[in-house]
């Protein structure tokens, strides 16, 4: 019985994420991502404003959403792999 209880505790610890960590895409390819460092609680995607296909040119983690520029439009979100 003690072995079963210990096993359940170990499995619970392994399965739980002790502290939330955000995962954001960090390349132009949508299937590659990284875990954001502490304090970076947003994912962003930058696209060229004047380009008709809206292909992302930059993705990553941020603490604040970057400001749009004349060349780049930024979209930010706060869930895993949302960019």
UniProtKB/Swiss-Prot annotation:
Subcellular location: Secreted; Target cell membrane
Secretion signal span: 1-21
CDD domains given in the database record: TFP_snake_toxin (cd00206)
Similarity field: Belongs to the three-finger toxin family. Short-chain subfamily. Orphan group XV sub-subfamily.
InterPro entries assigned to the protein according to its UniProt record, in alphabetical order: Cytotoxin_Cobra (IPR003572), Snake_3FTx (IPR003571), Snake_toxin-like_sf (IPR045860), Snake_toxin_con_site (IPR018354), Toxin_cobra-type (IPR054131)
Single Gene Ontology MF annotation: toxin activity
PROSITE patterns: SNAKE_TOXIN
A cellular component term, taken from the record's GO annotations: other organism cell membrane
SS bonds (residue pairs): 24-43, 36-61, 65-76, 77-82
Keyword Aminoacyl-tRNA synthetase attributed: no
A Pfam family matched in the record: Toxin_cobra-type
Name assigned to this protein: Cytotoxin homolog 5V
UniProtKB keywords: Cytolysis, Disulfide bond, Membrane, Secreted, Signal, Target cell membrane, Target membrane
Function according to Swiss-Prot or TrEMBL: Has low cytotoxic activity.
Organism phylogeny: Eukaryota, Metazoa, Chordata, Craniata, Vertebrata
Coarse class of the protein's main subcellular location: secreted
Free-text tissue specificity from the UniProt record: Expressed by the venom gland.
GO term, biological process aspect, one: killing of cells of another organism
Originating organism: Naja atra
